[in-house]
Amino acid sequence: EGGGNRGDPSGVC
């Protein structure tokens, strides 16, 4: 996980 993986998956690993 890197960014906003809750509402917006911007960087979900």
Swiss-Prot record:
The record's subcellular locations are: Cell membrane
Q: Which residues form the signal peptide?
A: none
Presence of the UniProt keyword Lipoprotein in the record = yes
Gene Ontology, cellular component aspect: plasma membrane
Major place of localization?
Answer: membrane
Q: Where is this site: Not methylated?
A: 13
Write out the transmembrane intervals.
Answer: none
Classify the source by domain of life. Answer: Eukaryota
Q: Name one GO molecular function term.
A: pheromone activity
Lipid linkage positions (S-farnesyl cysteine) = 13
Q: Which UniProt keywords apply?
A: Cell membrane, Lipoprotein, Membrane, Pheromone, Prenylation
Q: How does it sit in the membrane?
A: Lipid-anchor
Name assigned to this protein: Tremerogen A-13
Q: Which organism is it from?
A: Tremella mesenterica (Jelly fungus)
